[in-house]
Every structure is written in structure tokens, then in C-alpha cells.
């Protein structure tokens, strides 16, 4: 009897000693692991902090949003500027060194040599089809011409906003505009656009679908036309297809890294007064027409004030933005 009790007590003692040893071993292992992990975290934290020279900014909403950054007070040292001008400008200036001269003048305003790019275009149509807005800031000089007010106004609406567009097959389908942002954009050497609104039975309202002469003309011999019709109503279209293309587009929002300077004209063309344009910061300006040298001098003198109403953007944009946005 006593032997059994001694054996039981001995087993308890052995179990207790064994359990104590196991717990001590586990404790040492855990301490080792914790110390190692803590050491690694401390080392990585030091390394990551040593390399963090950037500014943490929340990325929310549109990429056009203007954020204050470390270069804002350094005269845009890390930015690029594209200046677009009509081909008549270098012809009148007649100086092979004029771009170098302007680059040196921009340098006095804080824009390093090589950060300003000069881009020539021949006419409004060419520029609207292929603008190549690749710089952080893009400023377009447009010479006011009597009779081209509508083309200039619609060019401004086109390049001051982003558009997502798709081709239209007007020979097979009827089309309707679904809201204020939905427009039809027509481009070409001579665009005449006619429409025939349809009722629920696809019969013409005030027009005959089989006779384009009865259609309503909404654009006549224009290079660029942004067509706005009654929303939620099907329309049959007739367009001068040999000299013109038309696309179904949705306005996505302002392209805030673009500004337009109207050269000459008694009044500035204000697209913000257009009921189809959402209120926005004015990025259209006017300078008096004298000579092109005077125009460029004015731009250089006020370049930093002009850029302040714009928002820098890192994406490069070209004509694909208007048609097939990528």
C-alpha cells in the first residue's frame, strides 16, 4: 500500500519537474523569437525612415486635384510647360533664335532651360484633332479671328475638359443624349450636322426620316461642332461624312492643367457662361493684339500667375483622351 502511494507521489514529482523544464524551454524560445522580431522591426524602421524623403499625400478623387507640394515655392523647378502657338507667330517674328530668347526669359521667372517646350499648330482643326497635351502645364495661344468665334469657343470647351468618346454609325442606328454631360462632337474641314427627333413610334417630329432636307440643321460648315440636343429623345442624324466625323462623347470633368490665352478680340470668349458647361475656375484669358513678340513677352511676364489657376498633373494626354480614353 505504501509502495503504491510512494510511486504516485514520485510520478507527480517527475511530472512537475518535466513540466517546469518544458515551460522554461518554451519561455526561452519565445523570448528569443520576440527579441529577434523586435530587432528586425527596429532595423527596418530605421532604414525606411532614412529613405523617406517624399511627402505623404492622400490619393482620393480626381487626379486633377491640386495639392500643396514642396516645389510650389520653388518656381516650378520640377515642372514642364508646353506653349502652343499658331504658325503665323514664327513667320512674323522671323528670327531663328526666338525660342532660345524666350527660354532665357522664362529662366528669369524660375523656369529652367529645357523645361519649356514650344509647339506650333497650323489651324484650329489640326490642333483640336491632335493637341498632344503632354506637359505638366499646357498653355494654348489662339489668335482671335472674326467669323471663327464658334470654332474657338468649342475648341476651348474641348481641350479644357476631358471627354470619353465612341464612334457613331448614323447609317444604322438612332442616337439619344442621356444627360447634360453627353454631347456629339463633330470634326472635319466642313461639318454640317442635321438631326430629326423621333417619337416613340420612331416617326419624325416635324421632319421625315426618309428626307434629310426636312431635318433640322444644328451645325453648318463648321470645323468643330459640339452638338447638344434634347435629352432622352432618339434622333436620326445626317452628317457630311466625306469631310467630317462625329462621335458620341461624355464630358468627364475639367482638364485643369490646360489654359487658353485668346490673342486679340474685343471680348474674351467665356465658355463658363454656356449652360452645358459646369461652373469651373476660369482658365481662359485675353491679351491685346499688337505683335507676336509683345504677346510672348506678356506670357513670360505673367506665367507664374497664369499657372497658379491651373493644377499640375503627371499624366500625359493626347487626342486619345477625346476619342478612346486610355
Swiss-Prot record:
Q: What is its main location?
A: virion
Signal sequence, renumbered to the chain = 1-50
- Entry PTM: N-glycosylated.
* Residue sites binding Ca(2+) 1 per the record: 95, 206, 214, 216
Region LVD motif: start and end of each range?
Answer: 237-239
Q: List the disulfide bonds.
A: 82-135, 165-249, 191-244, 196-207
Tell me which residues are glycosylated: 69
The molecular function terms in GO held by this entry are: metal ion binding
Q: Where does Ca(2+) 2 bind?
A: 177, 228-229, 231, 301
Chain segments carrying region CNP motif: 165-167
Keyword check for tRNA processing, yes or no.
Answer: no
Q: Which of UniProt's keywords are assigned here?
A: Calcium, Capsid protein, Disulfide bond, Glycoprotein, Host endoplasmic reticulum, Host-virus interaction, Metal-binding, Outer capsid protein, Signal, T=13 icosahedral capsid protein, Virion
Subcellular location(s): the record lists:
Virion; Host endoplasmic reticulum lumen
Give the family per the record: Belongs to the rotavirus VP7 family.
Q: What else is known?
A: Some rotavirus strains are neuraminidase-sensitive and require sialic acid to attach to the cell surface. Some rotavirus strains are integrin-dependent. Some rotavirus strains depend on ganglioside for their entry into the host cell. Hsp70 also seems to be involved in the entry of some strains. In group A rotaviruses, VP7 defines the G serotype.
Its biological purpose: Calcium-binding protein that interacts with rotavirus cell receptors once the initial attachment by VP4 has been achieved. Rotavirus attachment and entry into the host cell probably involves multiple sequential contacts between the outer capsid proteins VP4 and VP7, and the cell receptors. Following entry into the host cell, low intracellular or intravesicular Ca(2+) concentration probably causes the calcium-stabilized VP7 trimers to dissociate from the virion. This step is probably necessary for the membrane-disrupting entry step and the release of VP4, which is locked onto the virion by VP7.
Subunit structure as annotated in this protein's UniProt entry:
Homotrimer; disulfide-linked. 2 Ca(2+) ions bound at each subunit interface in the trimer hold the trimer together. Interacts with the intermediate capsid protein VP6. Interacts with the outer capsid protein VP5*.
Q: Which HAMAP family match?
A: Rota_VP7 (MF_04130), Rota_VP7_A (MF_04131)
- Protein name as catalogued: Outer capsid glycoprotein VP7
Which species does this protein come from? Rotavirus A (strain RVA/Pig/United States/Gottfried/1983/G4P2B[6]) (RV-A)
Amino acid at each position: 500500500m505504501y509502495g503504491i502511494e510512494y510511486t504516485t507521489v514520485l510520478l507527480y514529482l517527475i511530472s512537475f519537474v518535466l513540466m517546469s523544464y518544458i515551460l522554461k524551454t518554451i519561455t526561452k524560445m519565445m523570448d528569443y523569437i520576440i527579441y529577434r522580431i523586435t530587432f528586425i522591426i527596429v532595423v527596418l524602421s530605421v532604414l525606411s525612415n532614412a529613405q523617406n524623403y517624399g511627402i505623404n499625400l492622400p490619393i482620393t478623387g480626381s487626379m486633377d486635384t491640386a495639392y500643396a507640394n514642396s516645389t510650389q515655392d520653388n518656381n516650378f523647378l520640377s515642372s514642364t510647360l508646353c506653349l502652343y502657338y499658331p504658325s503665323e507667330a514664327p513667320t512674323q517674328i522671323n528670327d531663328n533664335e526666338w525660342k532660345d530668347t524666350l527660354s532665357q526669359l522664362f529662366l528669369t521667372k524660375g523656369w529652367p532651360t529645357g523645361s519649356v517646350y514650344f509647339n506650333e499648330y497650323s489651324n484650329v482643326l489640326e490642333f483640336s484633332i491632335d493637341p498632344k497635351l503632354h506637359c505638366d502645364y499646357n498653355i494654348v495661344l489662339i489668335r482671335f479671328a472674326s467669323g471663327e468665334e464658334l470654332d474657338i469657343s468649342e475648341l476651348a470647351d474641348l481641350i479644357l475638359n476631358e471627354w470619353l468618346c465612341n464612334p457613331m454609325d448614323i447609317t444604322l442606328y438612332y442616337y439619344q443624349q442621356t444627360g447634360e454631360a453627353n454631347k456629339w462632337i463633330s470634326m472635319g474641314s466642313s461639318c454640317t450636322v442635321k438631326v430629326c427627333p423621333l417619337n416613340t413610334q420612331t416617326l419624325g417630329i416635324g421632319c421625315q426620316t426618309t428626307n434629310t432636307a426636312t431635318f433640322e440643321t444644328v451645325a453648318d460648315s463648321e470645323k468643330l461642332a459640339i452638338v447638344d440636343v434634347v435629352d432622352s429623345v432618339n434622333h436620326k442624324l445626317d452628317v457630311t461624312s466625306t469631310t467630317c466625323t462625329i462621335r458620341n462623347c461624355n464630358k468627364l470633368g475639367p482638364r485643369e492643367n490646360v489654359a487658353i490665352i485668346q490673342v486679340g478680340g474685343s471680348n474674351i470668349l467665356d465658355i463658363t457662361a454656356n449652360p452645358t458647361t459646369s461652373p469651373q475656375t476660369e482658365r481662359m484669358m485675353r491679351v491685346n493684339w499688337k505683335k507676336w513678340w509683345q504677346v510672348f513677352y506678356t506670357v513670360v511676364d505673367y506665367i507664374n500667375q497664369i499657372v497658379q489657376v491651373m493644377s499640375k498633373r503627371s499624366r500625359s494626354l493626347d487626342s486619345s483622351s477625346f476619342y478612346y480614353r486610355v
